[in-house]
Amino acid sequence: MLELNAKTTALVVIDLQEGILPFAGGPHTADEVVNRAGKLAAKFRASGQPVFLVRVGWSADYAEALKQPVDAPSPAKVLPENWWQHPAALGATDSDIEIIKRQWGAFYGTDLELQLRRRGIDTIVLCGISTNIGVESTARNAWELGFNLVIAEDACSAASAEQHNNSINHIYPRIARVRSVEEILNAL
């Protein structure tokens, strides 16, 4: 049974923004992920626990965006006008802590670790899109930094169910506890 200490646990939501949602191909839809993440966020807020909303973003000229040559570039050719915005169902509030990242992981080049440590956080509940990219990069970094991790499996999605399931079944069990949103809500 999962037990979480409300005083030392934070929710970190990865890339739930309008420009990323279309890339949720499975096994959970973007709407399912956002609604479940919204339930988690509401519970954390009601308990006075911190909610971190992490977004990826660059300047208009993409000066600081990654540009290395790769075999499988991002499928995004043009970003929609509202690509930065959090979906309404996430219920973002002024009490949420915004983190802007420019890499896949939420720790590199941001003050996320500082924000967590100064609040006495030792456990992170992690969710978002994509399971195997932004969420996994953040999870790996968090584990390397000594944080306890809980992955909200049904509040994550990837480009395909296969990509999602690879992270859920093979990577996360080595660095985290993988649970449903319902199990996490019951543990808070």
Curated annotation (Swiss-Prot):
Catalytic activity, EC: 3.-.-.-
Cellular compartments per GO CC: cytosol
Gene3D superfamilies xref list: Isochorismatase-like
Similarity section: Belongs to the isochorismatase family.
Native organism taxonomy: Bacteria, Pseudomonadati, Pseudomonadota, Gammaproteobacteria, Enterobacterales
SUPFAM superfamilies: Isochorismatase-like hydrolases (SSF52499)
Encoding gene (name): yecD
Stated name of the protein: Isochorismatase family protein YecD
UniProt keyword terms in alphabetical order: Hydrolase
Pfam families: Isochorismatase
PANTHER family: ISOCHORISMATASE FAMILY PROTEIN YECD, PEROXYUREIDOACRYLATE/UREIDOACRYLATE AMIDOHYDROLASE-RELATED
Source organism superkingdom: Bacteria
MF (Gene Ontology): hydrolase activity
InterPro entries in the cross-refs: Isochorismatase-like_dom, Isochorismatase-like_hydrls, Isochorismatase-like_sf
Enzyme class, UniProt record, top EC level: hydrolase
